[in-house]
Regions:
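Selective transmembrane helix interface/packing segments
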Residues: 1-247
Length: 247
């Protein structure tokens, strides 16, 4: 039994200093597939909208937008409507990246680089609102409170926000992958112990691997993936709201 990270599928050699070669990994390919599928779904749901005689497709699109608006308003208020597309994009991308493993492709959320990229975007927005609300000088002065020797700890506290968000999402998704893999291996071993003595092909059939892994996959890939996407987006909304000085 082996647990490996994303494989490097292709390497583009460059002469750019400090950047090195550009590697095409499973994470990158799967992410682009998810983005292409989500873009196609959005185009399909959003075209041909009508004011009357609304189709089921349009009703589904309106339901998604309404629920997303309500989510942002409940967590951020009515002054942050410009972030509805961002929150919705992160939520959809997170769910898509979690569920793509169901069809046998590598899950981008099992790679820390994916969550780190999302967390960096959120961190930049948090810093933007803190500086916009308090001013650059007041923000820098706040890093020295209550005394200047606390500056390293205050800086670490600022950086810990995106780090904790990334590792929380990544850790929960990875743990689900590890548990599913261990269970699959354990069931294979159990099948071999109990039925390996049977003659011919019957002894090679992994009976305990039929059906049981599907239930764990249903939980970790579907339910768990949706919960983690919801938590990440909720934290994003709350942190941006607090950075803007809203209570």
């Amino acid at each position: 039994m082996e647990l490996n990270g994303a494989k490097i599928l292709y390497t583009i050699h460059t002469d750019i200093p400090f950047l090195g070669d550009f590697k095409i990994t499973q994470t990158l390919v799967s992410t682009w597939i998810v983005m292409a599928l989500l873009s196609g779904l959005a185009i399909w749901l959003g075209h041909g909208l009508k004011l009357e005689n609304v189709s089921k497709r349009q009703a589904a699109a309106e339901f998604i937008v309404t629920r997303l608006d309500q989510f942002v308003h409940d967590n951020m208020g009515y002054h942050f409507d410009q972030y509805i597309p961002l929150i919705g994009s992160i939520f959809a991308l997170s769910i898509g990246c979690n569920l793509i493993s169901v069809v046998g492709l590598w899950s981008p959320t099992a790679d820390l680089n994916t969550e780190a990229a999302w967390a960096i975007v959120v961190f930049v927005l948090i810093m933007y609102y803190k500086i916009k609300t308090n001013g650059i000088l007041s923000y820098l002065k706040g890093l020295l409170d209550p005394i200047f020797i606390m500056a390293p700890i205050n800086v670490l506290s600022e950086v810990s926000t995106p780090v904790s968000m990334a590792f929380r999402h990544f850790g929960n998704i990875l743990s689900g992958t590890v548990i599913s893999t261990l269970l699959y291996w354990a069931l294979a071993s159990l099948s071999h112990v109990l039925f390996g003595w049977l003659p011919g092909v019957l002894g090679d059939i992994q009976l305990f691997q039929i059906g049981i892994p599907a239930f764990t996959g249903l939980y970790f890939d579907w339910f768990g993936g949706c919960i983690q996407a919801f938590i990440f987006c909720t934290l994003t909304a709350i942190f941006i709201k607090r950075a803007a000085g809203e209570e």
